[in-house]
A protein has these predicted regions:
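Bacterial N-terminal signal peptides that target proteins for export
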Residues: 1-11
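Bacterial N-terminal signal peptides
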Residues: 9-19
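N-terminal mature-domain "stem" immediately C-terminal to a signal peptide or N-terminal signal-anchor/transmembrane
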Residues: 28-103, 111, 117
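Secondary-structure boundary elements
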Residues: 64, 83, 90-281
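Hydrophobic/aromatic-rich core segments of domains that either
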Residues: 271-273, 277, 288-372
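Low-complexity, Gly/Ser/Thr/Pro-rich intrinsically disordered linker/tail segments
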Residues: 332-410, 415-425, 437-442
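Extended amphipathic alpha-helical coiled-coil/heptad-repeat regions
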Residues: 383, 393-576
Length: 576
């Protein structure tokens, strides 16, 4: 069977779609996008309104060809992906920027025309590396400002500039860098997007970085520029001596562990300014502070890094992921394997949404910045260009089939379903497809299962609910036991809400027996024991509280002087 015939069969099988996935190639001229055409198209408009009309015309041409030839054939047309990337960049980045910022100012329009016409890679980079939640107007503003500072430097470090624009397009969240420091104590002085850009450029020119930022991917660079701390802090971190990325773990040992804070229940930094020199040379810190110190040191040296926090046998712990350009990401720097952490949580620097270490491994392990993923991002852009057409759902699903480990097209489709008031059964089918697609990543799969569980509950499908609930607990008893514990507590809470105290207690005891005491300490306490006991306290169930205390002590082994031990004692002492 020829490759062409294989494509034809796949296109017809996919979602039963024939209309836009037809393989009959019709003659419908599209611009042959190359460097010369790129320059002429971006410059060949006399006004913002003329440019906007031209963008819509280009999008219309693409859609006409799409409807006649189908996406499989169309995506084989030379330069098609660059054509879509430029159309997407123009429609979703440039036009909104011009409409909001001095749209009637001819000089501003000419400036942006010149900017993109002379920087051929910018539309492609933005289309392939942006996220649908990015503040696209602010992205263009940042890029223009960085280009105007020094056009030559910008041309050399364009990927760095793109990374800065995608991270700094919105304010850093209040939860940065972690919850154990007050924002007022952070060493941040008038944060501005030019600061990380200038620092990395100058550090590279001075030979102070591990890697050449011009050779790194935009996604990797996002994990370098995602810090608003002052240049003074970065310079301090930069002078710390390490020879290899593997040496980062050794930095934990140079920071004294502040056991007095644990003993005094002072988990939030109590020493004023949260500076690296205070952590490293004066006050020391607990695991969150140690990991923050090492993470900032890595970034100052141009090493992509991310801080994770998770629950283990002894309670909460912090560690980090660090990127070695030769061997890739290591998500276990400073992690205590004996603690059996099922998962670590962090902030994705591009969206500031929560991400787990297992999700990052899952995505980067197969696709990441691979050609298929980048191709899928352009197909996703094509879907967004058709958001108001009947082709949208078919295109969004096609893009997700090309990059099956990406969550983004699924999030977009779910938003579309809810915005269009889809019924519960339609949303249930969506989550069923999600579960099948993400079956290899337990956290993502469980997200779909839990969502489907709630739909079964709303539809009063009791047998389906009970069956799926048992399945989630069974599948996540070992590696992602935190998910199973959460499902168990949800059932216990439902019984408590109905004042079925004896049944709730039986389920509580079953959960303790089910997970045992080998590895689940922190999650078992914070996700099961603590909320269970709080509910009992509200209803003055003192006998059951005392029974919960004695049972929990059998199953949760705490080490004296740990956060978990403190919180365990504190829970029952407060109730007494």
């Amino acid at each position: 069977m020829t490759l062409l015939k294989q494509f034809m069969i796949v296109s017809l099988m996919f979602s039963g779609v024939i209309t836009i996935f037809s393989t009959e190639l019709k003659s419908q001229n599209l611009p042959k996008w190359n460097d010369e055409y790129h320059k002429n198209w971006w410059m060949n408009h006399g006004s913002v309104s003329e440019f906007t009309q031209s963008v819509e015309l280009l999008n219309k041409q693409i859609n006409e060809r799409l409807n006649k030839d189908g996406i499989v054939k169309l995506s084989q047309v030379p330069s098609f992906f660059e054509l879509v990337a430029n159309t997407f960049c123009a429609k979703y980045f440039v036009v909104p920027y011009l409409n909001k910022h001095q749209g009637s100012d001819n000089a501003s329009f000419k400036q942006i025309q010149k900017f993109i016409s002379n920087n051929f890679n910018v539309p492609g980079y933005l289309t392939r590396c942006s996220h649908y939640k990015d503040n696209k107007i602010e992205v263009i503003k940042i890029l223009l400002d960085l280009k105007n500072k020094d056009p030559k430097i910008f041309a050399d470090y364009v990927k760095l500039a793109i990374a800065v624009s995608l991270v700094w397009d919105v304010e850093f969240p209040d939860s940065w860098p972690h919850q154990n420091v007050n924002n007022a104590d952070l060493p941040i002085l008038n944060p501005h997007f030019s600061q990380p850009y200038d620092f990395i450029v100058q550090s590279h020119l001075n030979g102070n970085l591990f890697y050449d930022p011009r050779r790194m991917t935009i996604r990797e660079l996002c994990f370098v520029v995602d810090t608003p701390v002052s240049t003074k802090e970065k310079l301090y971190a930069q002078q710390i001596k390490i020879k290899r990325v593997n040496d980062l773990e050794g930095l934990y040992k140079m920071i004294p562990y502040d056991q007095n804070r644990i003993n005094s229940n002072l988990y939030t930094w109590p020493y004023g300014e949260y500076s690296l020199i205070k952590i490293g040379a004066k006050n020391g810190g607990i695991c969150m502070d140690q990991s923050y110190f090492v993470c900032q040191t890595a970034k100052a040296k141009g090493i992509p890094s991310i801080l994770f926090m998770g629950q283990g046998r002894s309670g909460v712990h912090a560690w980090l992921g660090a990127f070695d350009i030769g061997s890739g990401w290591d998500f276990t720097v400073g992690k205590w394997e004996s603690e059996k952490y099922p998962v670590g949580y962090a902030l994705d620097p591009q969206t500031w949404s929560q991400i787990t270490n297992s999700e990052m491994e899952y995505y980067l392990g197969s696709s990441g910045d691979s050609p298929s993923s980048l191709r899928g991002k352009v197909l996703l852009a094509l879907a967004l260009l058709n958001k108001d057409s009947t082709n949208f759902v078919k295109l969004i699903r096609y893009s997700s089939s090309v990059m099956p480990r990406s969550i983004e097209p699924w999030d977009i489709e779910y938003e579309w379903l809810t915005n269009n008031n889809a019924d519960l059964k339609s949303i249930g089918r969506f989550w069923s497809r999600w579960i099948k697609n993400f079956k290899e990543e337990s956290g993502l799969k469980a997200r779909g299962q839990i969502a489907l569980l709630q739909i079964f509950k709303k539809l009063e499908m009791k047998k389906n609910y009970e069956s799926l609930s048992k399945q989630i607990i069974s599948e996540n008893k070992s590696k992602r036991f935190d998910l199973g514990i959460s499902i168990d507590y949800e059932e216990i809470k439902n019984l408590q809400d109905k004042l079925k105290w004896r049944e709730a207690e039986d389920k509580f005891i079953f959960a303790l027996n089910n997970y045992g005491k080998e590895k689940s300490g922190g999650h078992l306490f914070y996700n099961l024991v603590q909320p269970y006991v709080h509910k009992l306290y509200l209803h003055k169930k003192n006998d059951q509280i005392e029974k919960a205390r004695s049972l929990s002590r059998k199953y949760i082994v705490t080490n004296k002087g740990t956060i978990l031990d403190n919180d365990f004692i504190k829970l029952f002492d407060q109730i007494e």
